[in-house]
Every structure is written in C-alpha cells, then in structure tokens.
Amino acid sequence: MRKRTEPVTLEHERCAASGSSSSGSAAAALDADCSLKQNLRLAGKGTAEPHSASDAGMKRALGRRKSLWFRLRKILLCVLGFYIAIPFLVKLCPGIQAKLIFLNFVRVPYFIDLKKPQDQGLNHTCNYYLQPEDDVTIGVWHTIPSVWWKNAQGKDQMWYEDALASNHAIILYLHGNAGTRGGDHRVELYKVLSSLGYHVVTFDYRGWGDSVGTPSERGMTYDALHVFDWIKARSGDNPVYIWGHSLGTGVATNLVRRLCERETPPDALILESPFTNIREEAKSHPFSVIYRYFPGFDWFFLDPITSSGIKFANDENMKHISCPLLILHAEDDPVVPFHLGRKLYNIAAPSRSFRDFKVQFIPFHSDLGYRHKYIYKSPELPRILREFLGKSEPERQH
C-alpha cells in the first residue's frame, strides 16, 4: 500500500508544484496583459482628444454658418418685404409721387443766399420778388447782357426793369426739378446767354428755393405765365424767347400753349432735354428701373401721378403751339432718354400748328459727355442759337 500511495503523493506534489508554477506564469501574463491594456487606453485617450477638439471646431464653424445664413435670410426677407411694400405705399399715398417728380425739397447747392446772385459770379444780376397769387411769392433773377456789367454796378431794381426795354432779346428760363435758380449748371448757362447779348430772366416756382407756395403743375404754369406777362409789360417790342430744361420743358409747353391760345405767342420756344409726357418719362427714369417690370407697374406708379393732376403732356401741347421750335438733346442723357426728345420732335415736325414755323432738332453726340445738363458747354451753342433765332420769324408760304 505504501508503495502505491507514494507515487501518487509525489505526483500530487509535482502537480501542486506544477500548478504553483503555472499560476505564477498566469499572474505574470495577466499583469503583462493589464499593462498592455492600460497603455492602449492611454494611447487611445491621447488620440481621441484631437478628434474631439476637431469635432468641436467643426460644430462651432457650422453654428457660425447657420447663424450667418439666418441673418442673411432675415435681411433678404426684410428687403423683399420692403420692395413689395413700396408700390402699395405709393398707390395709397400719391403725394409721394408728386414729391419725387418735383424734388423741390432738394436744395443744391446748399447754403447760398438767393438774394445775392453776385455770390454766384453774377455781378450784373438783380433779385426780385413777384406775387402771382395771394399767398404765393416767387424769387426772380434778372441777368442783363454782359456788355453792360459795369453800368449795372450799384443799380436798383427799377434800373434793371427799365433795361428790359433796351434793344436786346430776352430769354425766360424755366428750370427743371430739384435745386434752385442758383444751381451751378443753371448759373453757367445764364453766363453763356448773357455773353451772347440776351437778358436772362429766371425764377423759382412756388415751393422751390425761397419762393413761397405749394408745388403743382397748374401753379408752376401760372407762375411762368405771370413772369412772362411781367416781362412783356416792360420789354416793348423786344423778342421774348422761352427756354425750358427737363421738367421745365413741361412748364414751357404748357405756358406756350396758353399763350398761343390767347394769340400772344412767344418769339420762339427752346426745349433742352425734353420728354413726351410725364408717364413716359417716369417709366424711362433710372429711378424706376428696379420696378419697371413689376406686375402692375402702371397702376402702382404711373396712375397716382396723373391722378394727382401731373401730366406735363408735351406731346399733346405740340398740337396747339404755333411758334418756332428748337429742341436740344444729348445722346448720353441718363435722366431723360434721348429717344424721348427725338420722339417729341417727330410729333412736332409734321404738326399742322408748326407748318409756318421752323422746327429743328439738334442732337449732341455721346462722346461730348454733355449728358443731362451740360449742353451749355458746347462751343457750337452760340452758333446754333444765332442761326435759329435769326430765323425765328414765321416763314412765308410761296
């Protein structure tokens, strides 16, 4: 029995020893495995942190983009809403269109004293005030021919009024919208005309400059009629020409039509940068370009103009005017398109009312750069006026 159990015991001990040895190896292996896993976790943590920072940066960038797009969309919606609201505002408040047509609230140049035309280089000009109607007062400038500038120094209004009866023709100048009779380009034209030997009488319509009253087409026309009659009462048999520029061409044709109807026409009519009628001009004006193709453009924008009594129908007036007509227009005019001036000429030239009178259209090439208000710079202007006004008498039929 002892011999049998001894090997078993030894085997058991060997197994125990072997088990003890294998247990130590397993523990060592386990420790190594744990160390490896820890190192892997540490390594993983080190690589995960940059990915996490990158993701956060991308999220912030996307957030900023979304915020920017939201603000941009909000701005676009506001602009679109404003764009759509304006036509309805104009339709509901037609007085807005009248303001935009007249622009009498725009006084350029600023800070000039209209009582002192000499401050604008017009040292042979007198400032008057006339009263066409009750509660309406208009400021007037009278510039005499430049050859008299020395004699004019220190003279009073009476002297200037008497000078109208001298042997010099008179031009009644009707300016356009915005600004005053002291506008830079207007003053330069007065100087040119004065140097050619003309008296120049100009004024600010009611509501412009220092003139008192509320602007309207009827009122502007009546102011012009009052000044014309005032000139005729003092000028004897001297020729009186009417010169209208831009919106002033509408006043000019209204005035001349009334004068022809009462059989006291002027000696000639000069239209600088004219249009056919206010509807066509408003539709062609650069201000209207963003709405020109807006659905219902005429109903929203043009009908309120005519419903306010503003027509300035030069094309219609041409049928009732009987006096020499000269039209001046620059091809590069950005305000009143050249084609409207040409169209007006094509209406006037064959009209029966002009059959006994000279009708002339003078274009100025776009290369000259005269645009809307610089035709006075043309060195050809004196010749054009001399040739035309020298033929301003009715042509006899043969």
UniProtKB/Swiss-Prot annotation:
It holds the Pfam family Abhydrolase_1. The chain crosses the membrane at residues 75-95. It comes from the Eukaryota. One of its GO terms (molecular function) is lysophospholipase activity. Signal peptide: none annotated. Selectively inhibited by DO264 (N-3-pyridyl-N'-(1-[3-chloro-4-{2-chloro-4-(trifluoromethoxy)phenoxy}pyridine-2-yl]piperidin-4-yl)thiourea). It is a single-pass membrane protein. This is Lysophosphatidylserine lipase ABHD12. It comes from Mus musculus. The lineage of its organism: Eukaryota, Metazoa, Chordata, Craniata, Vertebrata.
